[in-house]
């Protein structure tokens, strides 16, 4: 069982534990997110997120095909697709559809606590998954990471505080995401994210997540070691912002 959790996090994990595996034959090659990030030289490495809503208040109803095409055409190096249904309005269909459209890495963004979810990510065309340290025991984190890697998928190991980071740095996780949003209170603390980013060794790929609103935010996060930027709410509200952020 995952860690002891409260509130909406406990609910979303309970739902995740019961989600069914989707059995389909993968038709898409695997696009390595790490490779796309490392090969980004003359622009900012942006992973554009598609989500219809969020517990923090977002509520947008955009066309997925139009959105992901636009992001790819305007320089995004990856697409993040929320597949959690209750709190983010996502679906496995969104992931499957996005995978048919773009030829850049796709992250299945969800509260992953079972191997079934990872199988589904692979089968529907995801190239990477998110593993959130906060909701997993150490043993679960390692097992799920290794399971994903054995399928050829990459995993972003997400941390929100120093405790999470301490666990993440004990293992050879090559991509670490630093979420500026506290998953319990939903408050964004960019200062804390900068502090965490600075503590991560440079041999890891560092992705800054949440609270990024403009080019200045990206410039600032780069000073603290961020290699890539996962941006959702800002781009869902105004997709044209990608041109400014790149």
UniProtKB/Swiss-Prot annotation:
GO biological process terms held by the UniProt record: L-tryptophan biosynthetic process
EC numbers: 4.1.1.48
Catalytic activity: 1-(2-carboxyphenylamino)-1-deoxy-D-ribulose 5-phosphate + H(+) = (1S,2R)-1-C-(indol-3-yl)glycerol 3-phosphate + CO2 + H2O
Keywords: Amino-acid biosynthesis, Aromatic amino acid biosynthesis, Decarboxylase, Lyase, Tryptophan biosynthesis
Gene3D superfamilies xref list: Aldolase class I
GO molecular function, one term: phosphoribosylanthranilate isomerase activity
Entry-linked PROSITE patterns: IGPS
Recorded metabolic or biological pathway in which this protein acts: Amino-acid biosynthesis; L-tryptophan biosynthesis; L-tryptophan from chorismate: step 4/5
Domain of life: Archaea
Protein family (similarity comment): Belongs to the TrpC family.
HAMAP family: IGPS_A
PANTHER family recorded: INDOLE-3-GLYCEROL-PHOSPHATE SYNTHASE (PTHR22854:SF2), TRYPTOPHAN BIOSYNTHESIS PROTEIN (PTHR22854)
Record-given protein name: Indole-3-glycerol phosphate synthase
Species assigned in the record: Sulfurisphaera tokodaii (strain DSM 16993 / JCM 10545 / NBRC 100140 / 7)
Upper classification of the organism: Archaea, Thermoproteota, Thermoprotei, Sulfolobales, Sulfolobaceae
Name of the gene this protein is made from: trpC
């Amino acid at each position: 069982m995952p860690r002891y959790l409260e509130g909406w996090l406990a609910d979303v994990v309970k739902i995740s534990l019961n989600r069914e595996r989707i059995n389909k034959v993968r038709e898409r090659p695997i696009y390595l997110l790490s490779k796309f990030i490392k090969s980004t030289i003359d622009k900012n490495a942006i992973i554009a997120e598609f989500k219809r809503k969020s517990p923090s208040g977002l509520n947008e109803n955009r066309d997925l095909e139009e959105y992901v095409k636009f992001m790819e055409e305007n320089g995004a190096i990856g697409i993040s697709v929320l597949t959690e249904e209750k709190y983010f309005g996502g679906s496995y269909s969104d992931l499957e559809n996005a995978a048919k459209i773009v030829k850049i890495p796709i992250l299945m963004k969800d509260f992953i606590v079972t191997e079934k979810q990872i199988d589904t990510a692979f089968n529907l065309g995801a190239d990477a998954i998110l593993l959130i340290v906060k909701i997993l025991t150490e043993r679960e984190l390692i097992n799920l990471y290794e399971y994903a890697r054995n399928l050829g998928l990459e995993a972003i190991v997400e941390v929100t505080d120093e405790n999470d980071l301490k666990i993440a740095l004990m293992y050879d996780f090559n991509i670490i995401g630093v979420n500026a949003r506290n998953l319990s209170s939903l408050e964004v603390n960019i200062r804390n994210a900068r502090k965490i980013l600075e503590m991560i060794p440079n041999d890891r790929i560092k992705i800054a997540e949440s609270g990024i609103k403009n080019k200045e935010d990206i410039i600032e996060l780069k000073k603290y070691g961020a290699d890539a930027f996962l941006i959702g709410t800002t781009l869902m509200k105004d997709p044209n912002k990608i041109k400014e952020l790149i």
